[in-house]
Amino acid sequence: MTALKTEQNIGRITQIIGPVIDAVFSPNKMPNIYNSVVIEGKNDVGDTIKCVAEVQQLLGDNVVRAVSMSATDGLMRGMTVVDTGAALSVPVGKNTLGRIFNVLGEPVDELGAVSTPEGMLPIHRAAPAFVDLDTNLSIFETGIKVVDLLAPYRRGGKIGLFGGAGVGKTVLIMELIVNNNIAKAHGGVSVFAGVGERTREGNDLYQEMCESKVIDTANLANSKVALVYGQMNEPPGARMRVGLTALTMAEYFRDVNNQDVLLFVDNIFRFVQAGSEVSALLGRMPSAVGYQPTLSTEMGSLQERITSTKTGSITSIQAVYVPADDLTDPAPATTFAHLDATTVLSRNLAAKGIYPAVDPLDSTSTMLQPWILGDDHYDTAQGVKQTLQRYKELQDIIAILGLDELSEEDRLTVARARKVERFLSQPFFVAEVFTGSPGKYVSLAESIQGFKMILGGELDDLPEQAFYLVGNIDEAVEKAAKL
């Protein structure tokens, strides 16, 4: 939280509409935009109330309009509002690892206060200067076949996981954090921002991290991740700012400790949604599909800070909810522009039981270039895409006339495409309880070798079910022997 100024600038509440608070201050003593203000007092039954809000508008007649970061229950007109004189500030540094925070930087895991020898940093900061940015191109291996082969992630880049409700965005994020031990292999730390998602998911993630020792409950100093949560039940102000709280913690590790940081955001759409709610509460005219007119600016102010400098990097993996599975909706469409790689999850593949339900033809990456990946990887990826694209084109003919009406060449393409489609599935560590199969980490070299063998016709005699939910190609051959 923000330390109060010695000479307090005090106002009074004049109006409360849900999470929006209007307060009047003395002339020439108005708080600045983005200053945090604190309201303390007692409600009707004598309970102490403390509410923190962020100034959003100066309305004239010495009145400011602020958006609350917590519930406004029990607040009354006439209550004292204290201007802290600064933006909301949150704790940073190694003591944040292994802990769970809310938007204000207050620990909510009942493990006591956080000592912050490194101090506090304001959540509103400028993006790094253009000359300080790092332009190095290298791949970030995840151990997930479909990702590493067809839409590889850039180390120090921004990655979006796009999908509608219930197709597996959160499971994919949990897999990337927990059981790949990316944070450990990466030699850095992770920060997880839970933006407007379910409390149950936040709790599940914490338990998973404790079990896999990403969070070491016995010795928090050995932990590799800090968690920042602003769930669905929080006011829109908290959901709109919790991403910035997490980003501020990540920036400290990058800029001061010169570390490589992984920033996970689940879900960036809720950040936009909260901004839309706040925009409406502040009386702004909505733009397309009811979104806030400042959508691009808000998204840019967050995304431009998630970047890699010459001293450290932030690799960001963001889940993006796609309303009604419509990728042209303004929220996902605005997010697309900022990303280096997009992993699109498909409801059709999920319905077929192919998990992770990543659409190999819709997913893209700026890293899929022969001069970055090498010809072997690039040619295999293109071969897989061409085979799947041809299969997609033939599906209408197959539905009407059946497989028998296809030419010999097309029948072979379809058989290989179906094997490729199944081989793109993979058992996850975090989904062991659902699949009954132990999780698998498949190296990039193994992935390339497996797909080359399928496309080259070396495995034409194996049944397609042998390729379903296995790790590398050797496991598929073993499974075929048992069928």
UniProtKB/Swiss-Prot annotation:
Residues engaged in binding ATP: G163, G164, A165, G166, V167, G168, K169, T170
EC identifiers of the protein: 7.1.2.2
GO cellular component: chloroplast thylakoid membrane; mitochondrion; proton-transporting ATP synthase complex
Membrane topology of the entry: Peripheral membrane protein
GO molecular function: ATP binding; ATP hydrolysis activity; proton-transporting ATP synthase activity, rotational mechanism
Top-tier EC class: translocase
Pfam families: ATP-synt_ab, ATP-synt_ab_N, ATP-synt_VA_C
HAMAP family found in the cross-reference section: ATP_synth_beta_bact
UniProt protein name: ATP synthase subunit beta, chloroplastic
Source organism per UniProt: Ostreococcus tauri
Lineage: Eukaryota, Viridiplantae, Chlorophyta, Mamiellophyceae, Mamiellales
